[in-house]
Amino acid sequence: MNSASREALAAARERLDALTDNTSVDAAKLAEELASVTALLDREVSLRRVLTDPAQSGESKAELAARLLGGQVGGETLDLVSGLVRSRWSQSRDLVDSVEELANTADLTAAQRGGNLDDVEDELFRFGRIVGSDKELRSALTSRTATASAKGELLRSLLGGKAQPVTERIIVRLVTQPRGRSLEAGLDSLSKLAAERRDRMVAVVTSAVPLSDRQKQRLGAALAKLYGRQMHLNLDVDPAVLGGISVRVGDEIINGTVAERLEEATRRMAG
């Protein structure tokens, strides 16, 4: 996003946080309604262009949103959308991306209120690993010929009763409304958004064998000291690394595995 869109999204995040600080607001319902607005804006290209047209006044765009959504969504959702369309946007799709982020954030807030946010973070990571290792499942979830309804039913059969309701909802939305993203990129964005709810960063840790609780605590503390923020550790076991651990934080990789050292030694010998 360019600066105008980033500023608009930052303001919307603040409005959402202020709104959901009030525990009487139903965060899950808010998420559902914002998700429906996302689908509408993604589908109606001309509408989102009108709602982001800099030649139109913010008030006229807010009035249009109110006419379209009035009676279909609650007052809190309408207030958030009105604030969004009053803002200036660098591109019309940035508005859709932002409404979608607010929907996911509202759902994650619902999980946080229920004390289930850690479970949601872990389930998102594990689901990504399952999809990455099951080509048939990934193909079914990303097929262009399968309907959104069929994909949703498949996911509900896989996740229903086995994952937190919030996890199920946001994964179903991601798969049925991919909006041009790969499944992996979408899951990664959701994991980062979940971590941000606790002002944490995400570290993907790969080791040959499971880490002990003490090792996890020490690693988390070391990474927090290194990056200046608390870390959520997504743990992956891969015997192929042979020994040691590999840590990925964002685009940065700290690799201390035996496999990597052997590969490096081989490169040096070949050179």
Curated annotation (Swiss-Prot):
Q: Which UniProt keywords apply?
A: ATP synthesis, Cell membrane, CF(1), Hydrogen ion transport, Ion transport, Membrane, Transport
For this UniProt entry, what's an example GO CC term? Answer: plasma membrane
Q: Where in the cell is it found?
A: Cell membrane
Q: Where is the signal peptide?
A: none
* GO molecular-function terms, A-Z: proton-transporting ATP synthase activity, rotational mechanism
Topology versus the membrane, per the UniProt entry? Answer: Peripheral membrane protein
Pfam families, per database record: OSCP
The protein's role, per its UniProt record = F(1)F(0) ATP synthase produces ATP from ADP in the presence of a proton or sodium gradient. F-type ATPases consist of two structural domains, F(1) containing the extramembraneous catalytic core and F(0) containing the membrane proton channel, linked together by a central stalk and a peripheral stalk. During catalysis, ATP synthesis in the catalytic domain of F(1) is coupled via a rotary mechanism of the central stalk subunits to proton translocation.
Q: Which family does the record assign? A: Belongs to the ATPase delta chain family.
- What does the annotation say about its assembly with partners? F-type ATPases have 2 components, F(1) - the catalytic core - and F(0) - the membrane proton channel. F(1) has five subunits: alpha(3), beta(3), gamma(1), delta(1), epsilon(1). F(0) has three main subunits: a(1), b(2) and c(10-14). The alpha and beta chains form an alternating ring which encloses part of the gamma chain. F(1) is attached to F(0) by a central stalk formed by the gamma and epsilon chains, while a peripheral stalk is formed by the delta and b chains.
How is this protein named in the record?
Answer: ATP synthase subunit delta
**Protein species of origin:** Streptomyces griseus subsp. griseus (strain JCM 4626 / CBS 651.72 / NBRC 13350 / KCC S-0626 / ISP 5235)
Name of the encoding gene: atpH
